[in-house]
Regions:
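HIT superfamily nucleotide-processing domains
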Residues: 1-109
Length: 109
């Protein structure tokens, strides 16, 4: 199986609009946004989905959520949604764990 697109983005083999990065996670703009502001926060390590987390991955979920919170503050979002899609039936399109940061709506949208 070919390496997934998010692994290639994490290795900087494919360009993306990176908003923040540390040793374990990377956040970048979604190329098919579902909201005025739509970023994906991914672990650099390939993990297929939440359903595939092992005991040694416990800290990665905290790091994904905390990184999304920091990015939302950096973007000055007043409100936002954090969403994990798990499996094809749950709406997951890319088989690499990722957290959607969605926001930027104005009142009434």
């Amino acid at each position: 199986m070919a390496e997934c697109i998010f692994c290639k983005i994490a290795k900087k083999e494919i360009p993306s609009d990176i908003a923040m990065e540390n040793d374990h996670v990377l956040a970048f703009k979604d190329i098919k946004p579902s909201a005025p502001v739509h970023y994906l926060v991914i672990p650099k390590e390939h993990i297929q989905s939440i359903a595939h987390l092992e005991d040694n991955h416990k800290d990665i979920i905290t790091e994904l959520i905390y990184s999304a919170k920091k990015l939302a503050a950096k973007l000055e979002l007043k409100g936002y949604k954090l969403v994990f899609n798990v499996g094809k039936e749950g709406g997951q399109v890319i088989d690499h764990l990722h957290l959607h940061l969605l926001g930027g709506w104005t009142k009434g949208e």
